[in-house]
């Protein structure tokens, strides 16, 4: 495939294979290698908690910001400058590839993704076309610039997992119970299979574009998959997540898998083929280490709400996360979910420094 060749060419020319980049604490931790300190980054580190982000986004809709390379680059770099995190994560949204292939959707402030015409039958599903690199030229342009700017600091690419994307398309927006999604999954298996196949291909291509442009790790956010039982996940989602991770194996970049409320699914998230499994705050990391398959690193898992407590509590809870993480084969420090919008940036800055200091060899 052309994109696969592009990604390999970039690696051969040093964008991915750079010695200093590969020796970064983040990539070493993902590969379960010794690290100079526990690496830190935060989900939603680029976002509403930063005043510089809010200023830049004034009057600019989310999907427009995600399609402007200049804004993507600046927003991605903001938390790197402020916090000294060990990795940047590409600024985008999981709905971007769906918007790029013509799905009528918007991201409404205070609501989230809203789809004009929910997809609930085979005809609508078959109208979802595949994603091509030319659909998202702004992604390639922005990532190439970011790789130049970041130097030896890794850039994480990402995409939405197939279940989460399916839920937004079927429900028409955010859902607490995912009732339409589950009804379709249970009652119309042929529609579900076709939808998941198409979404998996779209997700894979979106990740390939990012790797080809220079992303040195990728995370699959299947945020809402915790709504499923282990049995339903194994039957209806695992085959598609496994396929995505298997297709990514040739690029030799760390693959991270994350979902919220997935304590009972951690073994299955690991089974899907990720190198790193993200853990939310509900499961201690020493327990999580016993649930995932061997040769899997962990990411997480401080409760985002703890950051609103006095610093002594933040430090105590952080120490607990770090202590329990010793049971894992590799550890990337993160929150158990995204940074909350009203989080004080000064606390995050202090937290990064604290983790680096406490774990320095």
UniProtKB/Swiss-Prot annotation:
Keywords: Cytoplasm, Decarboxylase, Lyase, Porphyrin biosynthesis. It catalyses: uroporphyrinogen III + 4 H(+) = coproporphyrinogen III + 4 CO2. Its EC number is 4.1.1.37. Disulfide bonds: none annotated. Pathway: Porphyrin-containing compound metabolism; protoporphyrin-IX biosynthesis; coproporphyrinogen-III from 5-aminolevulinate: step 4/4. Gene3D superfamilies: 3.20.20.210. GO terms for biological process: protoporphyrinogen IX biosynthetic process. Pfam families: URO-D. It is found in: Cytoplasm. GO terms for molecular function: uroporphyrinogen decarboxylase activity. One of its GO terms (cellular component) is cytosol. Its main location: cytoplasm. Signal peptide: none annotated. Substrate binds at residues 44-48, 93, 168, 223, 337. The record marks 93 as: Transition state stabilizer. It is an enzyme of class 4 (lyase). Homodimer. Belongs to the uroporphyrinogen decarboxylase family. Catalyzes the decarboxylation of four acetate groups of uroporphyrinogen-III to yield coproporphyrinogen-III. HAMAP family: URO_D. This is Uroporphyrinogen decarboxylase. It comes from Thermobifida fusca (strain YX).
């Amino acid at each position: 495939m052309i994109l696969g060749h592009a990604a390999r060419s970039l690696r051969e020319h040093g964008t991915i294979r750079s010695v200093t980049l590969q020796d970064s604490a983040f990539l070493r931790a993902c590969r379960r290698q010794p690290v100079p300190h526990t690496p830190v980054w935060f989900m939603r580190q680029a976002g509403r908690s930063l005043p510089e982000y809010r200023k830049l986004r004034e009057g600019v809709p989310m999907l427009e910001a995600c399609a402007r390379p200049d804004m993507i680059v600046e927003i991605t770099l903001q938390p790197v400058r402020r916090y000294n995190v060990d990795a940047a994560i590409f600024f985008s949204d999981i709905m971007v590839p769906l918007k790029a292939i013509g799905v009528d959707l918007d991201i409404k402030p205070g609501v989230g993704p809203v789809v004009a015409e929910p997809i609930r039958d085979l005809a609508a599903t078959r109208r979802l076309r595949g994603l091509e690199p030319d659909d998202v030229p702004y992604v390639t342009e922005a990532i190439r610039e970011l790789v130049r700017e970041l130097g030896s600091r890794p850039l994480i690419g990402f995409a939405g997992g197939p279940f989460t994307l399916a839920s937004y398309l079927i429900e028409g927006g955010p859902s607490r119970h995912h009732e339409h999604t589950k009804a379709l999954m249970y009652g119309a298996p042929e529609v579900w299979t076709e939808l998941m196949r198409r979404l998996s291909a779209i997700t894979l291509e979106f990740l390939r574009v990012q790797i080809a442009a220079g992303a040195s790790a990728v995370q699959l956010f299947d945020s809402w998959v915790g709504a499923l039982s282990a049995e339903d996940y194994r039957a209806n989602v695992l085959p598609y997540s496994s396929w995505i991770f298997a297709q990514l194996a040739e690029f030799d970049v760390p693959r991270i898998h994350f979902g919220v409320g997935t304590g009972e699914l951690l073994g299955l998230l690991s089974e899907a083929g990720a190198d790193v499994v993200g853990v939310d705050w509900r499961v201690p990391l020493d327990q999580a280490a016993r649930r995932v398959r061997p040769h899997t690193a962990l990411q997480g898992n401080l409760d985002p709400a703890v950051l609103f407590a006095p610093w002594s509590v933040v430090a105590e809870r952080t120490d607990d996360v770090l202590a329990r993480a010793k049971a894992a084969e590799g550890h990337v420090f993160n929150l158990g979910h995204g940074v909350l919008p009203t989080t004080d940036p000064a606390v995050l800055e202090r937290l990064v420094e604290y983790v680096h200091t406490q774990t320095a060899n």
